[in-house]
């Protein structure tokens, strides 16, 4: 994938970049793997706002992705590589030998015609999925399960990858993209390779309207709100926040304040904490 730059024909175009979509082979998704996707606008079933900065955006259909990769022993072949509006990574349509079709996350380097396989006996090849116990130390992986059979939950964004560091009893040590080293059950599955579309992070949105197309609403500073809307609000003119430390809209300390529970059940699985950014 390459980044496409634009001439500054307007203020919105100046500095704007997009993907050239060179890896995409079709713009028509597989109809049998589409599901309706209803917009919530960040509201829950009571109509109350639970997630800020969401609303509007282009209409989408959900692509049903196979995160479990549990079709063991049946070879499949990549039919298309497609754009997915619901995630940063591209997706690949797999045609299996028994006639079934499934979408998977498209790893870096995958092409139309590539053969893939799932299961303990699969080769260590990009796109294949195996239990962690069967993956050699040093292998780069993505789409990692946390519970056997639940489906991949970690390392699914564009350009991300993890690495198998070692094996201890029924656990496998994996270094995640954040630098965190975590123990994961050896029966959990992972896919070989790095997630594709790795230059996604280099894209410059360019203008506010492009964020609105994505369904992202503006983020307003608390200091320009009224006191009943935010702890930083109020005052005459450009007033300071009037607090010892920055606060969230709900009055909790923020910007550097640690929010992780002191006694989290998953602490025993974390060998090394993530790197400070």
From Swiss-Prot:
One of its GO terms (molecular function) is structural constituent of ribosome. One of its GO terms (biological process) is cytoplasmic translation. One of its GO terms (cellular component) is large ribosomal subunit. InterPro entries: NA-bd_OB-fold (IPR012340), Rib_uL2_dom2 (IPR014722), Ribosomal_uL2 (IPR002171), Ribosomal_uL2_bac/org-type (IPR005880), Ribosomal_uL2_C (IPR022669), Ribosomal_uL2_CS (IPR022671), Ribosomal_uL2_dom3 (IPR014726), Ribosomal_uL2_RNA-bd_dom (IPR022666). SMART domains: Ribosomal_L2, Ribosomal_L2_C. Residues 258-277 have a biased composition (Basic residues). Part of the 50S ribosomal subunit. Forms a bridge to the 30S subunit in the 70S ribosome. One of the primary rRNA binding proteins. Required for association of the 30S and 50S subunits to form the 70S ribosome, for tRNA binding and peptide bond formation. It has been suggested to have peptidyltransferase activity; this is somewhat controversial. Makes several contacts with the 16S rRNA in the 70S ribosome. This is Large ribosomal subunit protein uL2.
